[in-house]
Amino acid sequence: MKLTFLGANHEVTGSCTLLEAAGQRYLIDCGMEQGKNVYENQPLPVAPGEIDGVLVTHAHIDHTGQLPLLVRNGFRGRIYATKPTTQLCSIMLRDSAHIQEFEAEWKNRKAKRAGAEPVEPMYTVQDAEAAMQLFRGM
């Protein structure tokens, strides 16, 4: 068994650990870093399509906030969480997506005036809804 700490290495947010055992790869959480520009969140060093599943410890965004991005980038495995965590994630991930879209829109209005390149939201409500389809409540 091998554990690789991918997030929350230098601070407490962005929890994400890769568990490799018996030829399978699972993430333990897939959280968003908070407290800085969310556009600085780094991609995973593992292709999302190579991950077999995600185990979610709880619904906080610093433990679940990059799940929609993971799905957007090709993850098709299952996301395992308790039923209450799944219910909370349904609300929180959609809300986070709304915030991502709003912030991108706001930054793009400023960028247009400054002649800068537009930015994309980290993920959209549609991405959050796609992620929710992969949840399996336990």
Enumerate the predicted regions with their spans.
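Short N-terminal micro-motifs specific to bacterial/archaeal maturation
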Residues: 10, 79-80, 119
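Short, low-complexity, polar/charged sequence segments that are solvent-exposed and flexible
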Residues: 22-25, 45-48, 74-75, 98-102, ...
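Phosphate/oxyanion-binding loops and surfaces in catalytic or ligand/nucleic-acid-binding neighborhoods
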Residues: 19, 92-99
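Active-site metal-binding motif and surrounding structural segment of the metallo-beta-lactamase
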Residues: 37-88, 94
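Hydrophobic/aromatic beta-strand patches that form the interior of the parallel beta-sheet core
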Residues: 4, 26, 55, 80, ...
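Metallo-beta-lactamase
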Residues: 96-138
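Conserved beta-strand hairpin/beta-sheet module of binuclear metal-dependent hydrolase folds
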Residues: 1-49, 53
